[in-house]
Regions:
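ER/Golgi luminal nucleotide-sugar-dependent glycosyltransferases, focusing on the catalytic module
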Residues: 1-581
């Protein structure tokens, strides 16, 4: 059977996602020819990958005009109508779905053997006041009986580049079914949704609003938008796909973590470090930056570093020459070596790390830690925080670096320390006050992905900025070239630039097209603790306050709140006195 696939691709970040590679790999054997039509620019390395892996036979780069139908039209035009009839079937498809969840060959064999079918698809939409019943256009396959018809040729020859998506749906997506049905051709879908009960649905578009039904009816593709639109059940959809289909659910997590912010709840469920054999390439250059403010804690870190099974360079920063001398003595006693730099007492552990820009840029993997204590809180706040962070981020470094070897992973952070699960310290209303600083830094770094931190309730961060990362993942932060003038002096106020940076790390990596992983806290705590901590009536709403800024400050407020009402009262009294006279 000689088949051709016209495959339309679009990615706003100009990348070819792994799920697209997988899709084409799984379907390659079905087609004699694959035409890859991209409505967005793609990187040269992706183009080379598609060619080297034989996932396409012809490439068409076009501007994103006219949506998918104009792209399919251009593909057919490039092939030439006289050559289209050489194929037994023509399949049009786009990359807006994950799959195939199951082997596609049986589907093709079934409909090719059915003489009552001239064209077929995955799902259809029932007739409404606006549209007639039609196959949804993310996948349609046309058999030879239809391809050879004048109706088929006329439909595609009349495609023009429409600019309104509703016009495309009305003129092309619905008409591609009705025009052929009216000409006497017959169609079927894997899931005929017109016969399905939709009374509990907002709209009878099963591909978008009811992904559970899609899986139940063994539709081999599930829409990307359906995952995003149904996040409340996405964990269970992913579990089903992982357990009941042949599709790697990780491809869904990876793609959604790139095209949307990577911290959605259903995505976080898949962010723990994977269990895998330790493998660290000897060629990788590794640096550990340790900021030592409390020299009495240095030995604790040196002992933790003994768990490493890889070579690394230790770079220590501190705030005074006296501490540098003390650190040298501790290193000498322990038999350890390090480069020690005095960086001052501004910027805590973050600015010292950023000042090492030129040196750290030479390394493949970088670990960043500091001798953590909490002067503002109880002893156990700093003690538990530090020891748990060491257990999560220092001792399992072999496993962390094994995970960082994956091209898609750029940063590893710690899970939430237990102190923050027993005590409500990170509060959504206070986080909201940090968001403007985060937005400002985002703009200053010139990052390209769109995000507004003020719309978010809280952030995924490595508490205390203990972190492992690839330099490229955080390069924009280093390129800010922050100085002491940009950092407030100690004692550090709340919601400072340092607090903003602590919260920004995984999002900076996301903008660089990296995902993150979380090193698990082995201190097991029942989630009922979180339930008790977070579900409180008292203090669940912010205290009422008055913002005088829009009134012109305190003087303006006095005018509106005191002087204005006083004048009104005086006027009323005068009117009453006149009436008596």
């Amino acid at each position: 059977m000689k088949r051709i696939l016209l495959y339309v691709h679009f990615n706003k970040y100009h990348k070819v996602s792994d799920h697209v590679y997988y899709q084409l790999e799984q379907m390659r054997a079905l087609f004699s020819k694959i035409v890859f039509i991209s409505n967005s620019d793609i990187h040269q390395e992706d183009l080379e990958q598609l060619e080297q892996r034989h996932l396409m036979d012809q490439f068409i780069q076009r501007h994103n005009k006219g949506y998918d139908f104009a792209a399919w039209h251009d593909g057919m035009k490039a092939l030439g109508c006289e050559h289209l009839v050489d194929f037994d079937s023509i399949t049009i498809m786009n990359d807006t779905c994950f799959g195939p969840l199951w082997d596609m060959k049986p589907y093709y064999l079934k409909y090719e053997a059915d003489e009552a079918v001239d064209f077929w698809g995955m799902t259809n939409n029932r007739a409404t006041k606006a549209f007639k019943e039609h196959i949804q256009s993310y996948f349609i396959s046309f058999k030879k009986s239809l391809v050879h018809s004048k109706e088929f040729r006329q439909f595609w020859e009349n495609i023009v580049e429409l600019t309104d998506v509703q016009d495309v749906i009305h003129n092309y997506e619905t008409r591609i079914t009705t025009a052929f049905v009216e000409a006497g051709f017959r169609y079927k879908t894997v899931f005929d949704t017109t016969k399905e009960d939709s009374s509990s649905m907002l709209h009878a578009d099963f591909s978008y609003y009811n992904p559970t039904a899609i899986l139940k009816h063994h539709v081999p593709f599930i829409k990307v938008k359906a995952i995003d639109a149904n996040q409340h059940i996405a964990p269970y959809l992913l579990d089903f796909i992982d357990q009941k289909t042949s599709y790697p659910a990780s491809l869904i997590v990876d793609h959604m973590s790139q095209v949307h912010p990577p911290d959605a709840k259903y995505l976080l469920a898949h962010k723990y470090l994977p269990e895998q054999p330790i493998s660290i390439a000897p060629s990788k250059k590794i640096a550990v930056h340790l900021h030592v403010f409390y020299a009495d804690l240095l030995s604790e870190f040196l002992e933790a570093f003994s768990h490493f099974h890889f070579d690394y360079d230790l770079l220590i920063t501190t705030d005074s020459k006296a501490k540098k001398a003390e650190i040298k003595g501790i290193l000498r006693e322990s038999g350890a070596s390090a480069d020690i730099l005095v960086t001052g007492n501004i910027g805590r552990d973050v600015l010292p790390m950023l000042t090492l820009k030129e040196r750290l840029s030479q390394y493949d993997y970088i670990g960043h830690f500091h001798t953590k204590k909490s002067k503002e809180a109880d002893f156990w706040a700093g003690q538990s925080w530090r020891t748990e962070l060491i257990d999560m981020m220092v001792k399992p470094a072999d496993q962390i670096l094994t995970t960082l070897a994956a091209d898609a992973i750029g940063i590893v952070i710690a899970d939430i320390p237990s102190f923050f699960r027993f005590n409500k310290i990170v509060d959504a209303w206070n986080e909201h006050l940090i968001a403007p600083e985060m937005n400002q830094l985002w703009q200053a770094m010139g990052l390209t992905k769109s995000i507004d931190f003020q719309t978010m309730d809280t952030f995924v961060m490595s508490y205390g900025t203990f972190v492992w990362f690839k330099y490229d993942a955080l390069k924009p932060l280093f390129d800010l070239d922050l100085s002491e003038a940009d950092i407030p002096a100690e004692p550090l106020p709340q919601n400072s630039i340092l607090h903003a940076i602590e919260r920004l790390l995984i999002y900076i990596a996301w903008d660089r097209h990296y995902d993150f992983r979380i090193s698990r806290n082995e201190k097991l705590l029942t989630p009922f603790i979180d339930n008790k901590l977070l579900n409180l009536r008292e203090g669940s709403v912010p205290h009422t306050y008055v913002d005088f800024d829009y009134m012109g400050g305190i003087k303006g407020a006095l005018k509106y709140i005191v002087i204005g009402p006083a004048k009104a009262i005086r006027y009323i009294i005068k009117r009453l006195l006149k009436r008596r006279v």
